[in-house]
Amino acid sequence: MRLSRRGLLRAGLAGTAATALGGLASGCAVPTGSTGRNMVLWYWDGGLGDTVVKNAKARYDSTVDLQAIKIGGYYRSKLITTMAGRAHIPDIAGLKGEDMASYLPNSDQFVDLRTLGADKYKNQYLTWKWEQGIADDGTMVGFPIDCGPVAHFYQYAVFRRAGLPYEPADVSGELNTWEKFFAAGEQLRKRIPGSSLVTDVNSIFENAVNQGSKRYVDKDRHFIGDQEHVRRAWALAVEAKQRKIVSNLVSGTPDQLSAVEDGKLPSQLGASWATSDLKTGVPKTKGRWRVADMPVRPANNGGSFLSITKACREPEEAFRIITWMMNAPNQAQGFVDAGLFPSTPASYGLKTLRAPDPFFGGQDTMDVFGPAAQKITVAYNSPFDIALGQPLKDEIKNVGVLGKDPKKAWSDAMSKCRRIADHLGVSY
């Protein structure tokens, strides 16, 4: 579900990272969690491939004792608290992509990876992903792990029965605009009563925003969530509701999963990691699915980084470990282990990722996700985006689920955004 407790917590604590980390003095002596030859790595369940972690421990055993620790619960809060407490700080820390903007303003608490030679690896990674790990002052805080290119998942037989294009290349070519996508949804509903093209309006709104180069706050700390790029995404979501191509179901609920299984929800816009969600959530649909390009251009949803904290006593060795763990073959293994889509284009052609997928009717989904990952637009991510984007996501959901008047919902969203902006010191 989109409005999980975790998601709400993130929205409410938008400025926490900046406040907590900002309390540390630059260059202070910070006790580390590692002692002697130990090197501590923090990450979360599914944040790294288990095979890659295991192999890294074995590979560097002669120089360090790599202690890779999976941190449960609210990872960001625990990392921030530990760093602010100046004790037991990990040498290497995973940083979730959705939280990255909160860490970048405090770049002085991390080792600048460029000073360790990061630039020589730059051309091996997606440009837009590489840029996301760099702070405004030029410090490279995060080394790329994965990304989440968004594509169009659909059920082959249902589309065929509805008289829609059903081969991946045809779906990509013929549903390449939002208008054509919506028209397909209307045809689907007409030919197969009770069916919907997508689960909810938030899928349309959020993906439309994520297709562009701007979000909710710009580099000058100015609120831009009332500008044309957001208004356009809002209008598309409202149109999807008005044209009745979205369901009244909530994503992730038993009713929604049943509708997917029954072919009543035969389509969704999802990131590469949604392949795993489908396989575990609706295993009986094996073989029914295919993947095509999403309308207009790809968006990104997800992806994380590895960092080296200032507490690290052996940053050069930590960097060697990071760069090895994140090379193309290991990123491919991370995809096999945990569905982490590689940020290294060289991975896309490796045999490991090129096996036909029976769940997707034998399709090689890398033919879609690989090119999509390379076409994503670089966007500025502000530490205030989460807080100032949430009212818009909440209100468009009210339009979709509760039938709230779109104009009233927009007005209410803007009022909430102004109050939050005032509190955070964001101009509008």
Regions found by a protein language model. Give the residues of each.
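Extracytoplasmic/periplasmic substrate-recognition and gating elements
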Residues: 58, 84, 242-243, 281-342, ...
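Conserved N-terminal structural module of periplasmic/extracytoplasmic solute-binding proteins
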Residues: 1-102, 119-121, 296, 313-317, ...
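Hinge/lid segment of periplasmic solute-binding proteins
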Residues: 96-151, 290
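Short, solvent-exposed loop/beta-turn-alpha elements that line the ligand-binding surface or hinge
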Residues: 114-125, 169-174, 214-233, 280-284, ...
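Glycine-centered hinge/linker elements that transmit conformational signals in sensory
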Residues: 182-186, 220-250
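Short helix-initiation/N-cap motifs at beta->coil->alpha
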Residues: 69-79, 98, 174-180, 248-262
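Paired acidic/hydrophobic, glycine-rich loop segments that form the ligand-binding mouth/hinge
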Residues: 91-94, 266-271
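C-terminal capping/gating helix-and-loop segments adjacent to ligand/active sites or protein-protein/ligand interfaces
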Residues: 250, 363-416
